[in-house]
Amino acid sequence: MNTAPKQYGFYMPAEWYPHERCWMAWPCHHETWSKIGLDKAKMAYARVAKAIAQFEPVTLLVNPGDEDSAKNLCKGHNIEIISLPINDSWTRDTGATFLINNERQLAGVDWIHNAWGGNYADCSLDNFIASHIIKYTEAQYFHAPLVMEGGSFHVDGEGTILTSKECLLNSNRNPHLSQQEIEQYLINYLGAERIIWLNMGLIGDETDGHVDEIATFIAPGKVLCLITKDKEDPNYHRLQENFEILKSSKDARGRTFEVYTVEQPPATYLNGERLTLSYINFYMANQGIVMPAFGYESFDRLAYQLFVQIFPGYQITQIDALDVFSGGGGIHCITQQQPKSHKLVEQ
């Protein structure tokens, strides 16, 4: 850990820091999209990419031979296509985690990926996505000796990390490490000072409780937390517990959080399995927010109205995202922001 980014002054900026681009990957894994099929998955990803491209460039990784479908569905928009062999399409988890320093130089962290604790047999190609992205952006490369996914943590860019015990302390990730050792890795590789641990994620989450489904930073000293008013819902107690933890926590600068809440949509099932639907799983672009709608008019409307309130100065774009969530994740899961840096990327 002597070569960790923090000692060189690098840290992960908050998602509201200006972006150079957004990274995505084109759907390709048949098992992931077995509920709806690859064609519908590609159309769903195209909706997200085009919505984000209103605000910033999108770079899309596409398996060789599948470029035509990406070009046809994303034609005429601010979207660049790069051919790269991939196993799956969740760049939040498999892509680089970007860092900057006070000189606005760019670095990238390459975590170890084990397909969310071994959910899928082959993730060999995805283990190279981060290094390819880092090389493409000419960022400084850091390899982290830790199994980690980008959706398992949030940062405020001011020293605070938000994560969950269900995921990071799961025996299918880093069983040889203690909580204290994992904390030290996070602090050193994300350039932070304090970690806030939530306990449990959503019931049925294939990622073992990624935090980007349950809570996120929305501004310095402010967090947004998922809740449900339905006491019979199996998520009720775990979401309420997370809410209480956030209310009683302070960030790295000693601020008590201002906690906003958004209600989860009604339980929704596909092929007998409950989908992990959450309005928390959105993408914050340059002056824009791309957030999900799930087809529940009153819930979607209330979530939209809340976002208008808590994100002043941002254009809120709400898109049908049920098909994205059918694959086990959401809008935040399929995107990865690259912060603006001192040296522009050479094309």
Swiss-Prot record:
Q: What is its EC number?
A: 3.5.3.12
InterPro entries, sorted: Agmatine_deiminase, Peptidyl-Arg-deiminase_porph
* BP term (GO), one: putrescine biosynthetic process
Q: What is this protein called?
A: Putative agmatine deiminase
Classification from the root reads:
Bacteria, Pseudomonadati, Pseudomonadota, Gammaproteobacteria, Legionellales
| Family the entry assigns | Belongs to the agmatine deiminase family.
Instruction: Tell me which UniProt keywords the record has, alphabetically.
Output: Hydrolase
Determine the domain of life of the protein's source.
Answer: Bacteria
Which reaction(s) are listed as its catalytic activity? Answer: agmatine + H2O = N-carbamoylputrescine + NH4(+)
| Species name | Legionella pneumophila (strain Lens)
List of catalytic residues: 333 (amidino-cysteine intermediate)
Give the SUPFAM superfamilies listed for this entry.
Pentein
